[in-house]
Amino acid sequence: MAKRDYYEILGVQKGADDKEIKRAYKRLAMKYHPDRTKGDKESEEKFKEINEAYEVLADKEKRAMYDQYGHAAFEQGGGAGGFGGFSGADFGDIFGDMFGDIFGGGRSRQRVVRGEDLRYDIEISLEEAVKGCKKDIQINTLVHCGTCHGSGAEAGSKIESCPTCHGAGRVRRQQSFFVTEQTCPHCHGTGKKIEKPCHTCHGEGRVHKTQNLTVTIPMGVDTGNQLRLAGKGAAGENGAPAGDLYVVIHVKKHHIFERDGNNLYCEVPISFTMAALGGEVEIPTLDGRLKVKIPAETQTGKLLRLRGKGITSRGYAGDLICEIVIETPIKLNEEQKELLRKLEESLEGKTLQRPKSSGFLDGVKKFFDNLGK
């Protein structure tokens, strides 16, 4: 079953701004929240669908990906890794605003904030894209502190619950009928009070580190494809899991081939004598050189399709399409020029031997005849 459009789910136009999207989400989430619908399966499914749509549309980068590629941008498998596990939308703030203590509030747990997703752009050659390759990359990211193992405290130091938020990392404030939830200003969301902060990370639990990674690039990738390396993003706060690393592929321009999907295109120059008489020409392919017969009376612009000689991706092999370009000889000596003049004279008036020229001249004659009427 095809997934519904995210904008349709929230009932907003594609050009809606962030405020409109948030407003629509609040209204629908209030309507279908499980605490209100009490076991209604259909409402639960709608609530999940609403959350999924908001996760994407509330994040600028993910929304841009969705606008360009639709649901395919977040599907796993194939050349581009899908988005799995979003961290862009802050549902805690929204639900704090909407529900607060209305549905048995007052209970608050410390949030586990997954680390940020990271992006790395990599440039590869067409040959590497076609056959697949391994690339060594270097990224600077946040990792859990090796001294305190992410706790933020020196060995033997006391770690107590924050007296302000009581370990929740969030504080709530009553505003008329609603309750707002915000990051605790004293512990900055950690929910902890550390007696003696770690000397390495200064109580943060994370440190910056340069990491060397090897990325396996599958065969058939193209510019814009993304590879998802799960858990290779920034480390989360308070020992929370790391985000993901997205490697974005950029294929360099090739000096011979142009790519369109799985098909490759190239120009093949031949002499005008070969075009007239036929012959054999050597064509470059991704598998090596290939000899191809040029039929007699070939015109410039003719396309030769070599099936299966393009790019193979996901089990499908594209074609190599060669466009014939007839070259005009230059720097002729007098003897050569005279031979060409004799050839030209021998073809004068013989329309069957000059199909393009005769057709053009007939068209010009008709054009001027019509002007004179």
Curated annotation (Swiss-Prot):
KW Mitochondrion (keyword) present: no
InterPro entries linked: DnaJ, DnaJ_C, DnaJ_domain, DnaJ_domain_CS, HSP40/DnaJ_pept-bd, HSP_DnaJ_Cys-rich_dom, HSP_DnaJ_Cys-rich_dom_sf, J_dom_sf
GO-annotated cellular components: cytoplasm
Keywords on record: Chaperone, Cytoplasm, DNA replication, Metal-binding, Repeat, Stress response, Zinc, Zinc-finger
Domain of life: Bacteria
Protein name: Chaperone protein DnaJ
CC cofactor note: Binds 2 Zn(2+) ions per monomer.
Residue spans, zinc finger CR-type: 132-210
Main location per the UniProt record: cytoplasm
Domain notes: The J domain is necessary and sufficient to stimulate DnaK ATPase activity. Zinc center 1 plays an important role in the autonomous, DnaK-independent chaperone activity of DnaJ. Zinc center 2 is essential for interaction with DnaK and for DnaJ activity.
Domain J: 5-70
Positions that bind Zn(2+) 1: C145, C148, C198, C201
Gene: dnaJ
CXXCXGXG motif repeat copies, ranges: 145-152, 162-169, 184-191, 198-205
One MF term in the entry's GO annotations: unfolded protein binding
Keyword Cytoplasm tagged: yes
